[in-house]
Swiss-Prot record:
It comes from Priestia megaterium (Bacillus megaterium). Its cofactor is Mg(2+). It is an enzyme of class 2 (transferase). Pathway: Nucleotide-sugar biosynthesis; UDP-N-acetyl-alpha-D-glucosamine biosynthesis; N-acetyl-alpha-D-glucosamine 1-phosphate from alpha-D-glucosamine 6-phosphate (route II): step 2/2; Nucleotide-sugar biosynthesis; UDP-N-acetyl-alpha-D-glucosamine biosynthesis; UDP-N-acetyl-alpha-D-glucosamine from N-acetyl-alpha-D-glucosamine 1-phosphate: step 1/1; Bacterial outer membrane biogenesis; LPS lipid A biosynthesis. This is Bifunctional protein GlmU. One of its GO terms (cellular component) is cytoplasm. The keyword ATP-binding does not apply. The lineage of its organism: Bacteria, Bacillati, Bacillota, Bacilli, Bacillales. Its EC number is 2.7.7.23, 2.3.1.157. InterPro entries: GlmU-like (IPR050065), MobA-like_NTP_Trfase (IPR025877), Nucleotide-diphossugar_trans (IPR029044). It catalyses: alpha-D-glucosamine 1-phosphate + acetyl-CoA = N-acetyl-alpha-D-glucosamine 1-phosphate + CoA + H(+); N-acetyl-alpha-D-glucosamine 1-phosphate + UTP + H(+) = UDP-N-acetyl-alpha-D-glucosamine + diphosphate. One of its GO terms (biological process) is UDP-N-acetylglucosamine biosynthetic process. It is found in: Cytoplasm.
Length: 68
């Protein structure tokens, strides 16, 4: 069986959104945007899920936790 990975690009301050929240943590339909991506990727048979973070890394990491 081959190894399959997914990479979530979750870096970015989101300054154009004019909000104190980081872009990937903005809620869409009751969940942070990044959670929608994680939910969809969790349906796949992946070896590992890698999340790239930048600005607000600690807040993003605290939400993502061990999901990636």
């Amino acid at each position: 069986m081959s190894k399959r990975y997914a990479v979530i690009l979750a870096a970015g301050q989101g300054t154009r959104m004019k909000s104190s929240l980081y872009k990937v943590l903005h809620p869409v339909c009751g969940k942070p945007m990044v959670q929608h991506v994680i939910d969809q990727l969790s349906r796949l048979d992946l070896t590992n899920l890698i999340t790239v973070v930048g600005h607000g890394a600690e807040k993003v990491k605290s939400h993502v936790g061990d999901k990636s």
